[in-house]
Structure formats: structure tokens, C-alpha cells
Regions:
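Aromatic- and charge-enriched surface segment that lines or borders ligand/interaction sites
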Residues: 65-109, 125, 131, 216-219
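Short, solvent-exposed loop/turn elements at domain surfaces
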Residues: 28-35, 58-60, 140-143, 185-188, ...
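Short, low-complexity disordered leader/linker segments with a strong preference
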Residues: 1-20, 58, 66, 103, ...
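Extracellular/periplasmic solute-recognition and catalytic clefts
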Residues: 104, 121-122, 179-190, 206-254
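Short, well-ordered beta-strand elements
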Residues: 16-27, 65, 75-78, 97-100, ...
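Surface-exposed binding/hinge segments that line
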Residues: 68, 114-157
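N-terminal lobe/hinge region of extracytoplasmic solute-binding protein
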Residues: 23-71, 102, 171
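Gly/Pro-rich hinge or "lid" segments in bacterial periplasmic/extracellular proteins
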Residues: 147-200, 204
């Protein structure tokens, strides 16, 4: 659900940063995918990416350009995109993928490991080719890689340093970079100028901490925030109330 605001003049638009402000009900104290909750999902999607995405019912390439299964269905090989770096300058390659998934599997300290737990081993074939081996064939192995809660890539340098659960350890390959946190108030992300893909529209994304649902809705109605995202943050009744107003538009995912 989004709030519309008055359009700036062309001269104003050239001078002002394009900023999107949204709100969540829980503080973003960690964005490490294997330990995050659903309300942290928006920050994870800004900063991290996986090998594949799920869009409109199809599995599509992201950091992997293509993939294939072995004849017996127990090995899944990904051919990786070249020339990608993490936010800290660490190269994205097959060794980085192997490091990431071996760090996560199996680790009882992480809450979101169901998809990772199925892995048997990971093989680096060459610099940009990696194979995941499984104990048996299973129809949903590729689908497992679509889940942002388990299958996005973190810089191996962050894993080695051990600060992957702090906000300073939010280092992925995504279109936005973590910039700052003000405890109890907001987290700010800025556009990744070295992003491998198309540059995002907004220069900055600010995620405010507003724990009360009524206060979040009032913030949307007043223009303090531009967006409320997800059923965990907005009831159906509140959605209907908000979208009945002339300055607020909404969309429902099927």
C-alpha cells in the first residue's frame, strides 16, 4: 500500500534524492538470512541476492545464468554470472558460493536451514561453475534456491570475520547497500553504484521502526511513510480502509 505525494518540479527532482520510506513492526537488528524473521525480509531483498529468483510462477536466473540437473537427479549444477562483486569488493564466484553454503550447512544455531539441510556436498567445478550434490533425487531442489530466507549469498569475508549477524555485516551483491541504523528509529540503505544489474529507481530506502499497527497506518495516511508492505504489517480491514482514501493506492499479490 503506497501513499501518493505532490509531484516536484523538474528542477526540484534533479536536486533532490529519490527516497522511499517504509515501516516495519520489529527492529531490523540482523539481516543475516538464516536467522531473520519475516519483517526483516524487505531489508534482505534490498541487499542480498540468490542464484535464482521466482517470478510470476517461473524460476528465473539471478546470480546464476543457467543450470542443469544430472541424469539421476542427485546433482544440480549452476553456471554463475561473471563480473559480479559483493558490496565490500569480494569477487562473486564458485568458491564464494561454496563458502556460503558450507558455512550454513549444517548449523543448529540458524533457524532457517530446512532447504540447506538437504545438501550432501558442494563441488567447485571451475571459477564460475558449482555443483550441489544430494543423497537422492527430489523434485523441489531448484525451488529451494528461490527462498530469500535461506538461499541468498553473503560475502565470504564477512563470514570469516564473524560479524555476519550484525548490521555492519550486511554485505551482499544486491542493488542497495546498508548505510546506517538509528536504534529504535530507522535503518537506511543507499543505492549500490557498482551493482551488476539495472540501477534501482530510488537513491535511498529508509525502513522506519513503528511497532504499533495504527501508528503505521497513520504514518502512511499523513505521508510520513510511502509504503506498507506485507500482510504481517497490515490487516485486510486496514488495507481496505487505507485504499479507500484518494491519495493511497494498493495492490494484492495472488
Amino acid at each position: 500500500t503506497t501513499s501518493a505525494s505532490q509531484e516536484p518540479s523538474s528542477s526540484q527532482a534533479a536536486e533532490e534524492s529519490k527516497i522511499l520510506t517504509t515501516a516495519v513492526g520489529a527492529e531490523l537488528n540482523t539481516l543475516y538470512p538464516l536467522n531473520m524473521d519475516v519483517q526483516n525480509n524487505i531489508g534482505t531483498k534490498l541487499c542480498y541476492e540468490g542464484l535464482v529468483n521466482y517470478e510470476n510462477g517461473d524460476i528465473v536466473p539471478c546470480l546464476a545464468e543457467s543450470w542443469e540437473f544430472s541424469d539421476d537427479g542427485t546433482a544440480l549444477t549452476f553456471h554463475l554470472k561473471e563480473g559480479v562483486t559483493f558490496h565490500d569488493g569480494t569477487p562473486f564466484n564458485a568458491e564464494a558460493v561454496k563458502t556460503d553454503f558450507e558455512f550454513a550447512h549444517p548449523n543448529p544455531n540458524f533457524s532457517n536451514i530446512s532447504a540447506v539441510a538437504k545438501l550432501e556436498s558442494i563441488e567447485v567445478v571451475d571459477e564460475y561453475t558449482v555443483t550441489f550434490h544430494y543423497p537422492n533425487a527430489y523434485f523441489a531442489y531448484l525451488m529451494d534456491f528461490c527462498y530469500p530466507e535461506t538461499m541468498v549469498l553473503v560475502s565470504p569475508a564477512v563470514l570469516e570475520e564473524g560479524n555476519y549477524q550484525s548490521m555492519n555485516g550486511v554485505v551482499g551483491t544486491g542493488p542497495y547497500v546498508y548505510e546506517e541504523i538509528v536504534d529504535g528509529d530507522y535503518v537506511r540503505f543507499v543505492r549500490n553504484e557498482n551493482y551488476w544489474g539495472e540501477q534501482p529507481y530510488y537513491d535511498e530506502v529508509i525502513v522506519k521502526y513503528i511497532p504499533d499497527a495504527s501508528a503505521r497506518l497513520q504514518a502512511l495516511q499523513s505521508g510520513e511513510i510511502d509504503l506498507i508492505y506485507g500482510s504481517a504489517l497490515l490487516t485486510w480491514d486496514d488495507y481496505q480502509q487505507a485504499t479507500s482514501l484518494p491519495n493511497i493506492a494498493g495492490a494484492v499479490a495472488e
